[in-house]
Amino acid sequence: LTSREREVLALMAQGYGNTEIASRLVVTERAVLKHVGNIFAKLDLPHTDAGHRRVLAVLSYLGV
């Protein structure tokens, strides 16, 4: 993951949604969506509902 993708993933792990992440990183929500999509792809997460994929991404980040 890129450093920005790791930042986004860390904020996801803290429970922030896309809007809050965009605000904290001073980027557009569309940019956050792109980073989240890249995270899912790079972690090879299955195409399920977005909430489930976010949980899987956070678990991967935490090493669980």
Q: PLM ranges: what are they?
A:
Residues 1-37, 59:
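Helix-turn-helix DNA-binding segment
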Residues 40-64:
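Basic, Lys/Arg-enriched C-terminal extension of HTH/homeodomain DNA-binding domains
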